[in-house]
Amino acid sequence: DMVFYKTAEEATKRNVSIVNCGSCGACSNTRDVGTYHKMSNTLTKAATKCGISYLFFGERVATYCMRESTSMTDACIDCWVTNMGCTMTHCFKECVLKFELPINSPNNPEGKSDSHVSLTSCLLCDEMYCSPNFIRSCGANRRCAGVNTDIGRPKSSICPSVNIID
């Protein structure tokens, strides 16, 4: 219902789906969060491929690529493509020149425990420069939506309260 509830209990009492922890935004809906869950092990690869198309062919092609690769809403796709542009602007060296794209450099290949997981320089750069705006505008990223992805982030960073009511 795009309402921010202070606690999961408050949302549960009102019998509404909890699609993400934190503020709501363009991706805070059951369709986009459902896509995050359905593509938990493939969305990074799809988005990276579309990010590469952004690099070579621009925003319009990246948007088309995301539409063809996912079932996200147009508003959420716009968020992802805007984030790709941010990453290109701020993290080109870390992600492209070092070829440390998420599909080439697994973040946690040894399955380390939460306290020993560290982000690749590409992911760390994106976290520092692009993630805050994504969260402000888009609401649900995969961690906020309770999705354990192929990136291998600490489990403690993944929202445990997501509960989508059919």
Regions inferred by a protein language model and the residue ranges of each:
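General marker for long, soluble alpha-helical cores
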Residues: 1-166
